[in-house]
Structure formats: C-alpha cells, structure tokens
Amino acid sequence: RRSGMRYDIIVLGGGPAGLSAAVAARGRNKSVLVVGNRWQDSPLARAERVDNYLGLPGVTGTELLEQFRRHAEELGADFVLGRVISLMAWNGFHLTVGSEIYEGETLILAPGVVRQAKYPGETEYLGRGVSYCATCDGMLYRGKPVAVVGRSGDAPREASYLKSLGCQVVYAAAKRPETLEEDIPFVQANRLEITGAQTVTALVADGAPIPCSGVFILRDAVAPTDLLPQLETRENAIRVDRSMSTSVPGVFAAGDCTGGPLQVSKAVGEGLVAALSAAEYLDRRGSEPPAGASSGT
C-alpha cells in the first residue's frame, strides 16, 4: 500500500468478487486498494474442488484464489490486511483499518456473506462503552476494567495491547484461544449481554456480571450495513441495480453480499461490473465543471 495516498477505488473484500473488481479497475487505469482478511480465510480457500468454474474443472479453491490475487498484484493493485472498523462517507470515503485510515473516491463492497447476530445491549451502548477496535479506543480506558469478546483470530493480540495500556482485561469467549496470554483472566461463556446506565457497567456472561467500563467486541468482519447504515438491503442482501450501484452514491457492491446464487462465477462477473461502473462514475464526475463555473459561448 502507498501511505497517504487517496485511492480512486477501495475494495472491501479479498475474495473472487473483490479481486475481480481490482483487476478490472486497474484495467481502467484506476488506483486500487483491496482491504481484507488473509485470503486463506476465504470460504473459497476451503473448497477442495471446484467443478463449475468455466474452463477450469477440478481446480481447488486455493489455486483459484492464488491466481486471482497474483493477477491483481501484477496489475498494480495495493493490498492491506485487517478488519475495517469504521467507515465515514464524507468527501469520498475514509476507512479505519486497525489504527490506520485510508481514503478513497469510491467504494466497492465485496465482503462475502457477513451474518452476525448482535449481543443484547451492543447497539444501545455503541460509542458509550462498546467498541470494535482496541487500538482505536483503548487509550480511553487506560487503567480501567474492560472486557474483550473474542470473535476473531487477532482478538488475543488486541487483548494484550489493552493490558499493555494498564487496562484490567477479562477475555470472554466460547473457548480459550491458545494465543491468549496466561495472565489475562478468561471467562468461558456462550450467552453474552451488555448492561449499563448512561454508559456500560458490565458484561453479563452466562448470567454472571463482569463489572467493566468498556466492552471490546472483536469480530473477523463488521457487516457493511453497520459501516454504512444508509445502505438499503433486500432479503438480508445489499440491494443493487444492474450496474451494481447501491443506494449510496459512489458505493458499489458485488459477490455474495448481494445475494444468491453463491457462486464464484457470479461473484467474478459482478466484481467486473462494479469496477467498470465505479470507473465510469469517476470519469463522469471528473468531467463535470466545478460548481458555479460558466460554460462560456
């Protein structure tokens, strides 16, 4: 990635749809940043055999993803690994990934299927004790008791970061991760609830309250509709038109997040269309005269 650069297109998701979008966008000479988790974590990577991808019967999911990513890299797409914690739509789009902020003119959503039930109290206390990013908000809780809800591979590392700040950390999950520091208290729980008054006062784990000032819920991904609440959906999928445009200007979507069928070929095709539409959007906007400018005679 190129630090401090404002990208023409930021692609959220490194699966077939996102990588197809990156290839098509580079073909239109647009700068592209792909943000996602490790490609090995993609559902396609776990497919031992793919028999319905045109021209490549019997290919493994890993082989397909490796070819897709290599193609995008060779064309000059930039990549960053991490979870998108927040997204601000103002003068383009500003994405927070870990502790870094990336800027883009347009956004292509291709995160796959992100279904995640909210914990009771999560939405109510978001920003009032509930956070999705330890590196972003940890300093606010220096020296205070906090709970980490571990739902991602890097959650133990973020718990260690909070501990290094002087936070009194308790880690809650269905199973203790092997990489969790031994001196961080662990609570095994399947049912979690966040309670409080004006702000968070406790994480309730299987009925037992854990007093805390903050709860860090660390998932592998944040649902696009949580990042952009104004996104319109239909049957739990992002609503798009034939150009893969969403209800938010400058935002396009492709792949499994737009609904079924959940097929690689469909994702690749939609990624292509989304990138071409984003490029056309940029070109059209770039050709518009500045506000108040006279066309002359």
Language model regions located:
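Short, Lys/Arg-enriched N-terminal segments with co-localized hydrophobic residues
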Residues: 1-4
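Beta1-alpha1 glycine-rich phosphate/pyrophosphate-binding loop at the start
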Residues: 7-63, 144-178
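Glycine/small-residue-rich loop that forms an oxyanion/phosphate-binding "nest" at active or ligand-binding sites
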Residues: 75, 79-143
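A Rossmann-like FAD-binding core segment of flavoenzymes
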Residues: 66, 72-96, 102-104, 164-242, ...
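A conserved FAD-binding loop/helix module that cradles the flavin
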Residues: 22-23, 156-161, 166, 254-292
